[in-house]
Amino acid sequence: MIKLENIKKSFITGGVSSEVLKGINLEIKKGEFVAIIGQSGSGKSTLMNILGCLDTPTSGKYLLDSLDISKFKKDELSNLRLKKFGFIFQRYNLLSSNDTKSNVALPGIYAGMSKADRINRAKDILVKLGLETKFDTMPNHLSGGQQQRVSIARALMNGGEILLCDEPTGALDSSSGVMVMQILDSLHKDGHTIIVVTHDKDIAAWADRIIEIKDGNIISDTRKNSQIYELKQNLKEIKPSLKAIRDQFFESFVMSLGAIKSHKLRSFLTMLGIIIGIASVICVVALAKGSQQKILSDINNMGTNTITIFPGKGFGDMHSGRVRSLSIDDSNLLGKLDFVDFSTPRMNTSGLLTYANQSFSGSLRSGSEYSLAISGLKIEKGRDFTKDDIINSRSNIIIDQFTKDAFFKDVDPIGKVILFNKQPFTIVGLVKRDETSFSGDNLTVYAPYTTTMNKLTGDRDIRSIMLKLKDGVNAQVAEQSIIEVLKIRRGSKDFFTRNSDTIRQTIESTMNTMSLLISGIALISLMVGGIGVMNIMLVSVFERTKEIGIRMAIGAKSKDIMTQFLIEAILLCAIGGSIGIGLAYAIGYGFNVFGGDFKMIFSTASIFIALGVSSLIGIVFGYIPARNASKLNPIDALLRE
């Protein structure tokens, strides 16, 4: 079964090579009960580690069932430990966070057993070892003898064809020690190959064969009894399946969650950077979307799909006063274009509003029967202007809410006569309050442009023309057509245009750019949080080196260790991300209830992206600690306290 040929093992300490095993030749048959005895430093523990595939020889050949495993790779050795060996340690090496049955069932996870099969088998073994009342007991509530019996049960979980016992009674009192040796003797008679490493001759006396080692050499090999028992029962090999892989992944998830729970405060502090980062990003996006929607809504209220024409070369043109102003004929011509729904000339005049011995300065905006609709204003009370008002220059006026509040706070203004620059006007309508972010608090009234021309200013020129395009018309194409028509009519381009769609697109682009910029700044906090996760995971790997060694000893492969720590990092970030989303919603609720003129708008996409980003951070920043954990040498990890 086991054959060692000229096995040597050297260690380099301080640049000096020290040979611990000096050419060991040994053969152990199936079903033997062997004791390897020797003083401290004799090399017996090193020999046991090589026999159990926890360590590799410097040179020589190790044959297991006629298979040369001395050159096996790390995961191949893990597979051998999983299927062939069971380890019983002096200090038990139970996981303190797992109860008794979970400690025993642990090797079954890496063997691909289903959860039900693992637990049932673990309980069966514990019952045979007299621990039927301790299934759910934590290791720190067990006596030394009970803990060692749990360790034996764990070694038998995957069959334990070869049991390697390192000073199995070293930490026990004499009666518990005898009980453990009786169990090992019984297992030998069941056909298990037992290899005990000890310095105690009384313990070695239980074995049928005693091998003494000194200074790295075997100095004696004596047999008391040549009887060999055949293994009566062994587990069938479990073939990997999709369900087994899924169950193993789930168990890694559960173990990772348990590790996080066991250090609640540290885990929360680790998540804090992720929480703040995710909440910041989501809030920034929600604020950007809310403010963008508010501004675009304001633009819509001002009139969508509109084009306005002004005289001059642009706003602030010092020579615009010399430019021949736009005319009513220009407005009428543009109103007849196929793609124009309607057109209205516009004029603005400042003056004094007077009613019942009260006077306030205000603005008079003049236009056609379409001007209020084009501007996105709606009548709250009364009526809009009619064609008759325009044709006959009626002295009718429509007031806004500020004018009503100033003169008619508790009175219905419809039908009342108000003066503008001493000219009487009858109030026929009241517009709804303009809630846009562009509205001011000035008193504003509206009149037919013909009335303003004929009864107030006498000026035939207009300051702008506003066009409402038909639905489905491309605003940019329409704008170019309007420019060409006016250039031909006026002989030159002494005017400029303002396209509401262009303004909308510019604002959207600006808001998106600002949102990206601020989100980029918020992402920095996510990166800082990710680095924090990596630091804590590196500390966790260092603190749990012993646990990693135990898992590797019972058969965990590098990928199993890496998966567990990677899942742990992803979980930390995902939980932190979820809390961050909750925090963002709480902030949004408070803002929307007590905030200003606009609401924070959360999008489903931003939430999924936030969760995805937090998980990605877990993968990226958890990779290095997980890789470090997976690269640990089993024996080095086991020996670290």
UniProtKB/Swiss-Prot annotation:
Gene3D superfamilies: P-loop containing nucleotide triphosphate hydrolases. Homodimer. PANTHER family: MACROLIDE EXPORT ATP-BINDING_PERMEASE PROTEIN MACB, MEMBRANE COMPONENT OF TRANSPORTER-RELATED. It is an enzyme of class 7 (translocase). The chain crosses the membrane at residues 268-288, 516-536, 565-585, 601-621. This is Macrolide export ATP-binding/permease protein MacB. Keywords: Antibiotic resistance, ATP-binding, Cell inner membrane, Cell membrane, Membrane, Nucleotide-binding, Translocase, Transmembrane, Transmembrane helix, Transport. GO terms for cellular component: plasma membrane. Its EC number is 7.6.2.-. It is a multi-pass membrane protein.
